[in-house]
């Protein structure tokens, strides 16, 4: 835009269980964009740097291994610590309210993001209320809302890092 920057969420990959793994995510990205882009950046939750009991690699090591062809020295845009929830909530709300030089555009095709941004609620502590629900088929419990909006938060707080830092100080 003339007076600022547009941040556009033009696609999403919200893979259902049992395909909601780092490997399957990378495969889906490669299938859709592998022959159409020269480089990629990745953003996300700081917990992706931690090893799980399921794998010898962290989620981000899997991403780096599988997307190596499209990555360069500056591709990893993840943080070692997540931005504070309340600060990032207020910063994102300021963007939506037009109080910053940034503008967030979410394509209607990003259905999970639209649903998440529409229905996520605030808990009594000012954080995101991560309602737990149980999948009727698998029996697994998961958070109904919050993952898509968290991913947007992490990306925006990193892309707009200097503005976010000033906001937090201010």
Feature roles, as predicted:
Residues 3-137, 162-163, 170:
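Mg2+-dependent endonuclease catalytic cores in nucleic-acid-processing enzymes, primarily RNase H-like
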Residues 138-168:
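Acidic, Mg2+-coordinating catalytic module of metal-dependent nucleases/exonucleases
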């Amino acid at each position: 835009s003339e007076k600022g920057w547009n941040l556009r969420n033009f696609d999403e990959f919200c893979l259902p269980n049992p395909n909601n793994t780092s490997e399957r995510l990378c495969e889906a990205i490669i299938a859709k964009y592998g022959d159409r882009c020269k480089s990629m950046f990745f953003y996300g939750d700081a917990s992706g740097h931690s090893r799980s009991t399921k794998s010898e690699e962290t989620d981000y090591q899997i991403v780096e291994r599988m997307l190596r062809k499209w990555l360069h020295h500056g591709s990893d845009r993840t943080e070692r610590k997540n931005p504070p929830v309340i600060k990032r909530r207020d910063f994102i709300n300021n963007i939506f309210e037009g109080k910053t030089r940034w503008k967030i555009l979410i394509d209607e095709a990003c259905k999970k993001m639209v649903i998440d941004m529409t229905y996520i609620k605030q808990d009594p502590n000012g954080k995101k209320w991560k309602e737990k629900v149980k999948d009727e088929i698998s029996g697994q419990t998961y958070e109904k809302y919050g993952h898509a909006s968290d991913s947007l938060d992490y990306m925006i707080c990193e892309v707009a890092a200097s503005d976010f830092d000033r906001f937090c100080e201010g």
